[in-house]
Amino acid sequence: MKKIFDEVRSLDKRAIEEFHLTEDILMENASLGLKNYITKKFKKNSSILIVCGSGNNGADGISLARLLQNKFKVSLYILNEPKTEIGKLQLKRAKSINVNFVNQIFQADVVVDCLFGTGLNKELDQDSVSLINSLNNLNSFKIACDIPSGLNSLGQITQTAFKADITITMGALKTTLLTDIAKDFVGKIKVANLGLPEDIFQIETNKYLLQKSDLKLPLRDIQNSHKGTFGHVNIVSGEKIGASIIASQASFAFGAGLVTIVSQNEKNIPCHIMQSKSVSENCTAIALGMGLGEIESLKLEEILQLNIPKVLDADIFYNPLIVKYLDENVVLTPHPKEFISLLKLTNIANISIEELQENRFLYVEKFCKIYPKVTLLLKGANVIISKNDKIYVNIFGSSKLSKGGSGDVLSGLIVSLLAQGYTSLEAAINASLAHTIAAKKYKNNNYSMSPQDIIQGIKIL
């Protein structure tokens, strides 16, 4: 896991005050981070266009031009003259070694965006909007310095934003880069070292970025076992049996020893999945909500009252009964529209999808502060998983998963791990990672993946 911070100004300040680095040293290391990436990735004498604003982000770019001089064909475009003293000093240094300044942008091999940093707190003027749009239209490899210009400190876009192939962010990961809105603009994310070891520069935080290496598969280490050793999943089916079948197959593929669909009507289901009209006596985890539709309230409450680990999904988030059971150790897996309903039922907020998507971290934190026992998994382009005051972000999701049934696979994976003894937080994190990594490895085109393809991918992780 990697630490994530809402802001890093305090980290920069601490580096200066406690570890005696200077603003100049921090900036030199920021520029070195950019320079090292460019030097490693691109051939000598490639054309590099560095586009700078008037603040410290622009000063980073001017410093970068100096470091790349004579190794690449460097051109420096300055939208506005530097306002800061360090920016003016960097400009003087660049001029002293005859860095090439240009008055127009052009098609270069590489474009580096150094216009605006994380301090952007106002609407862009028309010149800036036009420039960013023109940069986006260039067929160049695009690098954002620290943050794509146009993203504000909350990861929101008011007019336009630079669309990077990679963002090289300075010192530490920032929440602003990990919003759903930002995902189409940041590209890959790489952290540049600012002159101190990571564990010294960074402090404690409550937010973490999940890595592929964090995935812990339910591998079977014991040989003296039987099917009951690995848990018995019960998936409660409502009107739409398809969702329950998908979830049951995912559970079985992810290690559950037994899987039963609980339904009042006999259904035609896969032969390795069992059926029952009531929850099994030896059930070790329940999934409820997928394809639920209308179900008798007494029957629903009877299931919710069972002291068994649960995954709650889909239709359940529109039922007021759920509020009574949010003090229990359950996993909730809403998509944004369902989470809005849940926020309304709990009197936390009455907001639109747009408001939620612009402030996903905020509303997740609000919800989990009031319901600290719950593990919440908010679906999205970047999945947010939270329990109590801790937040974990999974950025491995892709548009391949934007298909009906993908969420049912996820619920099946989570309940499978719960049945096998994982804690609610462990189950949510590992199932989410498995779900997104399996989808990422899907080799065919990105519009054709089905739930069965995800399940097949799970089997070969």
What are these regions (language model features)?
Residues 126-142, 296-314:
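A short, gly/pro- and small-residue-rich
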Residues 109-110, 115-205:
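Internal gly/pro-rich beta-alpha loop/helix module
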Residues 93-97, 119-124, 289-293, 310-311, ...:
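Short, flexible loop segments at the rims of nucleotide/cofactor-binding pockets, characterized by
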Residues 80, 103-105, 171, 193-195, ...:
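Residues at the C-termini of beta-strands that transition into short coil/loop
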Residues 35-114, 123-145:
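Nucleotide and nucleotide-moiety/phosphate-recognizing core
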Residues 1-71, 75, 166, 177-309, ...:
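Small-residue (G/A/S/T)-rich helix-start motifs and N-terminal tracts that mark the onset
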Residues 94-100, 125, 148-153, 214-219, ...:
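Short gly/ser/thr-rich secondary-structure transition/capping motifs
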